[in-house]
Amino acid sequence: MNPTHSQQPHLTIIGAGLAGCEAAWQAAALGVQVTLHEMKPTSFSPAHQSADLAELVCSNSLRGAGMNNAVGCLKEELRRCATLFMQAADATAVPAGGALAVDRDAFSRYITEHIEQHPLITLQRNEQCSVPPEGTVIIASGPLTSDALAPHLAQLTGSRHLYFYDAIAPIIEADSIDFSIAWKASRYGRGGDDYINCPMSRDEYMTFVEALKTADKVAGKDFEKVIHFEGCMPIEEMARRGDMTLAFGPMKPVGLPDPRTGKDPFAVVQLRQDNLHATLFNMVGFQTKLTYPEQRRIFRTIPGLQDARFARLGSMHRNTFINAPRCLDQHLRLTSDPRMFFAGQITGVEGYVESAACGFLAGLFAAGQLTDHAVPLPPATTGLGALLGHLSHSSPDDFQPMNVNYGLFPPLEGRKRKRSERRLAMAERALRDLEPWRQRVLSHIPDLKPFPAEDSDDV
């Protein structure tokens, strides 16, 4: 796929987030000229702050790094396929126990610089308010698709957009944390002292939960229907589900004994390193849509955070996605108009890694169509194939966003295995089955050594 410059096919991509950037990178690597449209800095969504591409607006964690977690398997697949996403993640990683977390600013800057420097990618910083009437297009406008573009996408897909809120967790300056109360440790001592832990007694916890239940929230727009995705549930919504929901969820204390007592507290608030210099820590699982004054008031009641300085307070934003099983084919093409591809969270995948994976595939599929080189589907036994299976084979009547998980993978044949053994066997099968597909589709990428299977400790 190396046509001369005058013969080079052209691809338009709308949206330069994780999916759009990865799609552009892959298509350009296969000799396609790409025009990548990004509305920042001309226009910002309610959740974005940086002019850089591929901005991480929720957590800075890319989740579990080991093979015992399906997202760890998917990351290794993307690593073996030489994705820009994994190059950036590995280059900007920060300590996070058994998870892979990144310095969010360095990560976005890495991707931005590589996109800007690629000779076949033209970055145009303007808001696309409609879809080009001609040519091959990838829509990767993300969960925060602009109000101007959304009606055009609704018309294209012939379906209503569904809205729910992804809530963003606060970030705290490390030197404002009281370490006479808080301490550093990872759960069960795995992965080093990568988390800061703030303990709560039963009375402190119950008071905290009650405060969350009665706190003022930011009101959503009248036309937005609130459908919360379980993986990014606001902490105040979890508190309303039951007094002990948080204690068995993001505030679970098991494996985190307080060094002052030697015993597990009743509940624990964990903070995870957010930048390379370890000056910023985000509150794990504390996505929220509380008003800013309420966040300061309530979160400063947490022992160890009484003097906390917030580098960023939590916020909420809309998530827009299409009914992929009804609208798209297996190659992420719009069934009613095969020149149109969709990629990223707007398709109904959920999470940073999944969005990048979807962009990776869309870029390959679009480039293949443009150059008359059909790109085969990845094996269903891989994380990549499992994601495509979710988008194409789920029931269209109750389709919802989904993180990658081993439940999406085909079951193993043969004898029954324990859960941990079964997951590792699925990962080994995925990486084994990926290789012939990778060699066929990405022949310019050299063979890589096997990746060791490890357990994950993603909190």
Swiss-Prot record:
Annotated FAD binding sites: G15, A16, G17, L18, A19, G20
Keyword Methyltransferase part of the UniProt annotation: yes
Pfam families: GIDA
Needed cofactors: FAD
InterPro entries: FAD/NAD-bd_sf, MnmG-rel, MnmG_N, TrmFO
Keywords, in A-Z order: Cytoplasm, FAD, Flavoprotein, Methyltransferase, NAD, NADP, Transferase, tRNA processing
Subcellular location: Cytoplasm
Keyword set includes Zinc: no
One GO term describing the cellular component: cytosol
Gene Ontology molecular functions: flavin adenine dinucleotide binding; tRNA (uracil(54)-C5)-methyltransferase activity, 5,10-methylenetetrahydrofolate-dependent
Recorded catalytic activity of this chain's protein: uridine(54) in tRNA + (6R)-5,10-methylene-5,6,7,8-tetrahydrofolate + NADH + H(+) = 5-methyluridine(54) in tRNA + (6S)-5,6,7,8-tetrahydrofolate + NAD(+); uridine(54) in tRNA + (6R)-5,10-methylene-5,6,7,8-tetrahydrofolate + NADPH + H(+) = 5-methyluridine(54) in tRNA + (6S)-5,6,7,8-tetrahydrofolate + NADP(+)
Enzyme nomenclature, EC number: 2.1.1.74
GO biological process: tRNA methylation; tRNA wobble uridine modification
Broad class of where this protein is predominantly found: cytoplasm
Similarity comment: family membership: Belongs to the MnmG family. TrmFO subfamily.
Function comment: Catalyzes the folate-dependent formation of 5-methyl-uridine at position 54 (M-5-U54) in all tRNAs.
Protein name: Methylenetetrahydrofolate--tRNA-(uracil-5-)-methyltransferase TrmFO
Native source organism of the sequence: Syntrophotalea carbinolica (strain DSM 2380 / NBRC 103641 / GraBd1)
Name of the gene: trmFO
